[in-house]
Amino acid sequence: MGLKCGIIGLPNVGKSTLFNILTNSNVDALNYPFCTIKPNTSVVTVPDDRLFYLAKLAKSKKIIQSIVTFVDIAGLIKGASKGEGLGNQFLHNISEVDAILHVVRCFNDKNIINLSFDPIEDINIINNEIIQFDINLINKLKNNILNKNFYKWKYLLKICLNYLKKGKLLNFLSLNLKEKKFLQNLKLLTIKPMMIIANLSINKIKNKFFLEKINILIKKYLVCKICLKIPQKEKKLIFFKKNINLKKIIILSFKLLNLHTFYTVGIKETKSWSILKGTTALNAAKKIHSDIQKGFIRVKVIHFKDYIIYKNETQIKLAGKIRIEGKKYVILDGDIIHFLFKV
């Protein structure tokens, strides 16, 4: 699944630095606005101890991990939705991602070209721009409301418009799955799940004011605290290895995308597959190959904890822990799945 996390924020808050350390890249991360113009993209494998343990038990020759794509999007500024800076271009870049990592500077530095010292205020600047983008988009869609595809959603667009005008993000609006899917297909920005990346100073004393602000944010957002500012005497690689839990950030990004993992296990290969929570066995089959979905018969299901206890399929079968399920079975996180199908 080619799911993407977009890294956004004001200029010079650490977006490109975060992108570089997540993806082991070397894009420019300089102290002036719009250092990044075109979005940088890179793929990262998702850390998964379960996958490697299953592969070890099965003596697999090959291990294939799930992936998440990270996109480094240029800095937004106040007025971006009206075209300030290169705003419209950057906002459209956000529309192409599935989830948002919003980097916020949580330290003072007179050398940085961005004088705001309040992370909540900075978040609100970005939120206001993506809210206005969505208001503009919905107003344009109202002109197409006679289109059959939109007419039945007229009530929802009206609710969304009123919600946005109150300064609220649509990802906080209570929606059913069909409503959410419709809004996602419109590529609205505020419907996308968002995580705040709080870029703190290594100096804990200096962080006191900002930590108080972060504690306010935690009540509303998923928040990950990191330090992207390297002390002058430290070497970059050593500093990041000591101070940044990359595994945590990647796993939280995976969680933000609302994904589950299932596994196919064998001697030839053991592979993890990323699916949206709530995916049925029939739809998961298509992820492997469309022919498996077309010829779907049933699935054999083993849960991860049973594989760990009994070590191999023979013992699992003797223990009665292999379940047979049909096409409507909702796959759970950690399921080991064997698809039975006809060609």
Regions picked out by a protein language model, each given a short descriptive name:
Residues 83-86, 114-118, 209-213, 237-238:
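Short, glycine/charged-enriched secondary-structure capping and boundary segments
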Residues 44-45, 74-81, 95-136, 143-148, ...:
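Conserved Switch II/interswitch segment of TRAFAC-class P-loop GTPases
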Residues 1-13, 19, 139, 143-343:
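C-terminal-of-GTPase-core extension/linker across diverse P-loop GTPases
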Residues 29-39, 46-48, 53-56, 78-79, ...:
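Generic structural "secondary-structure junction" signal
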Residues 1-84, 88-109, 127-129:
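Conserved G1/Walker A P-loop phosphate-binding module
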